[in-house]
């Protein structure tokens, strides 16, 4: 039995809460920007994903006009840092609705690290930073999708399983990314499963999963 819900009947705020409680888990873009007056801003945004592969682009969504969006529009630059589990409380603290003249790095005790290609700093304590220049800010209703072209990725060397020039990739246990759920809930990476995608030429002609879902809640 399912409950059918019509967004307009429930109301936009209640349906927003429903969306964020069911579109889960959501990776977090920890976005660093600089205002036109030179004030550094840092804020978490949980509507975040890869937007394009070639050229490499990532995107985050600002619900309403917040300092991150205002600064990106003014300067055309931002940095997205990974939000790691050890910085859980500081990441949450940067979501406080500080006035625009407050530097969140200083407010929560984080270290700004100079970026190589843009003015906004990286979070030194974060294992991953993507330096971006604005490609497009797309307005959708009450929100704005900010798409940035990645100029440089800075990743802790000890996070890699081997030399990235030889195909090495960061180990998930070294990154320990946080994700947002509904309400005031967050999640850690938890159990990691690995399975290869089936090529059509290897398709057996029938399909039967080896592990069937439990009927218990």
Regions found by a protein language model. Give the residues of each.
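Basic, polyanion-binding surface patches
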Residues: 1-217
């Amino acid at each position: 039995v399912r409950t059918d819900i019509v967004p307009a009947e429930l109301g936009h705020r209640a349906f927003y809460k429903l969306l964020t409680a069911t579109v889960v888990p959501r990776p977090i873009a920890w976005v660093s920007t600089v205002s036109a007056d030179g004030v550094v801003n840092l804020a978490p945004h949980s509507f975040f994903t890869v937007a394009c592969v070639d050229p490499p682009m990532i995107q985050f969504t600002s619900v309403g006009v917040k300092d991150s969006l205002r600064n990106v529009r003014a300067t055309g630059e931002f940095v997205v840092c990974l939000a790691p589990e050890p910085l859980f409380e500081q990441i949450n603290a940067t979501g406080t609705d500080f006035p625009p003249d407050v530097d969140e790095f200083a407010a929560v005790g984080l270290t700004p690290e100079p970026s190589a290609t843009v003015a906004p700093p990286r979070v030194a304590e974060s294992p991953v930073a993507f330096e971006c220049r604005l490609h497009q800010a797309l307005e959708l209703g009450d929100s704005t999708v900010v798409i940035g072209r990645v100029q440089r990725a800075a990743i802790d060397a000890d996070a890699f399983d081997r030399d990235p020039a030889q195909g090495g990739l960061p180990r998930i246990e070294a990154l320990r990314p946080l994700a947002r759920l509904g309400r005031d809930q967050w999640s850690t990476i938890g159990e990691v499963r690995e399975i290869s995608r089936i090529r059509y030429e290897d398709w057996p002609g029938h399909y039967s999963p080896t592990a069937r879902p439990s009927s218990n809640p």
